[in-house]
Amino acid sequence: MGYDYALVHVKYTIPLAALLTVFSYPVFTRLDVVRTLFIVTIAFVATIPWDSYLIRTNVWTYPPDAVLGPTLYDIPAEELFFFIIQTYITAQLYIILNKPVLHAQYLNSPATLPQWIKSGKLVGQLALSGSVLLGTWLIAKKGEGTYLGLILVWACTFALFTWTITAHFLLALPLACTALPILLPTVYLWIVDEMALGRGTWAIESGTKLELQLFGSLEIEEATFFLVTNMLIVFGIAAFDKAVAVCDAFPEKFDKPADALAMSLLRARVFPSSKYDMQRILGIRQAAARLAKKSRSFHLASSVFPGRLRIDLTLLYSYCRLADDLVDDAATPEEAAVWISKLDRHLSLLYKDPDATSTPLASKYAAENFPPSALSALDMLPTSLLPREPLAELLKGFEMDLSFSNSAFPIADPEDLELYAARVASTVGQACLELVFCHCQHGLPDYMKAYLRNTARQMGLALQFVNISRDIAVDAKIGRVYLPTTWLKEEGLTPEDVLKSPNSEGVGKVRRRILAKALDHYGEARDSMKWIPSEARGPMIVAVESYMEIGRVLMRNGGSAAADGSGRATVPKSRRIWVAWSTLMAA
């Protein structure tokens, strides 16, 4: 009886697992629990027969004074725990690194699959098949290559299966989502294993190994083992996540979302890719790209929303951003007015009838009147879950922007500022909440939903005031001043002065007044967010806090923005992540 192997866990594996658990805890969902249990169970069950064979045939040994004693099929308890802890560590890292990624956008049908992915899948199949054959030959040959052969035959057979059913999805994902969860735990375990082998905690029997070391005492067989097992873990979770992505991307095919853990998830796993609605996938892809490019704060917050709600919120953001860009990027005020009119007409067609008969009319109108790059955002707006009023009011906010083109400054007083912010931001806040009500299980009575709608609109005011305070210099470059003229007058300024010198001391004082109003609205609405349905509460608070942090940075700077070169105040990415993590811990 000894404690050497147990101490390896105490010193190296358990602390790392605990650290990853603390980091992932705020974003760890019920679906993540199932992911982890799924892959840990498979890894544990699949490894026991193989490892037991190694020990019984004396390929792999443990000195009696290095282990505690209890065994299962001759496998020491510490080794059994290693199966679990290694899988858990790799799974946690995979989950953390994949949170920012909207997996649905990486689905492909055979018709849309890039050639390099097709080739990559084939290369992987050939490499894994070759590894199985090499392993078979080494086992048959017996002698020094036996242990490596047993590793290759066992691991690469499973890997070949999961690669075959998941490679198209795996290869489409960013490398950070797949390569890092394999490589980082592998290198860490190489270091741990090298120290353990050097101390004799466990040993590979002479005559069954190649006597080659990757570095130090680390045998090439052990290095291969950790690499291929971490590949198996990532391949297995990716196979699970592909089913989740399919289930969430196509609500018309699967009545229950993936996080409901219903039969829909199993059906999604075998749903043929040839039946994917690729117009929808391409639309989701474009919407996700627009969100990532245009709003770092909301993109970060979107990472922690549940699947279908995340998709619909992304589509809503894409529509609102597209509409804003069409108006802002118009060459003339007349062109901008035309875009607003077309957007209003498109909304009228979308909401013309309670059934779907108007959708083809809206799609046809969009195809005839909007650029091709706009069509997916227009067609995929989730109107079946949204009332028309907030979207129509948003267009009225764009109409206020047109007043600037007539050499007029429409924000004459604080009431105009509130009206403008209500139209362009409170509306979006309410629309987001409507999607939450549709996607999340709740028993909220109508009066409470009305109360939360008012709260969302008030929080929208706070966020828009922060936005205005941040972008004074940016807006001045295009001839716009959203600061109330009456407040400017109190500082001896006019809107024209802001255009000439947007970073003056007087402008800074007005900025601070707007930020103070933003914090007032935030303070009045923040506590009410505790009544938002639990699935969306934390993510919604993250969205708010990530944006309000910009306001706090501006306040700490005395009202003058630290700019990123475009005139916009910035919050470092590390700070945004900390705000999101700490917010979720407290939510």
UniProtKB/Swiss-Prot annotation:
UniProt keyword annotations, A-Z: Carotenoid biosynthesis, Isomerase, Membrane, Multifunctional enzyme, Transferase, Transmembrane, Transmembrane helix
| Pfam families on file | SQS_PSY
Keyword ATP-binding attached: no
Q: Name one GO cellular component term.
A: membrane
EC annotation from Swiss-Prot or TrEMBL: 5.5.1.19, 2.5.1.32
- Task performed by this protein: Bifunctional enzyme that catalyzes the reactions from geranylgeranyl diphosphate to phytoene (phytoene synthase) and lycopene to beta-carotene via the intermediate gamma-carotene (lycopene cyclase).
Q: In its UniProt entry, what is this protein called?
A: Bifunctional lycopene cyclase/phytoene synthase
Q: From which lineage does this chain's organism come?
A: Eukaryota, Fungi, Dikarya, Ascomycota, Pezizomycotina
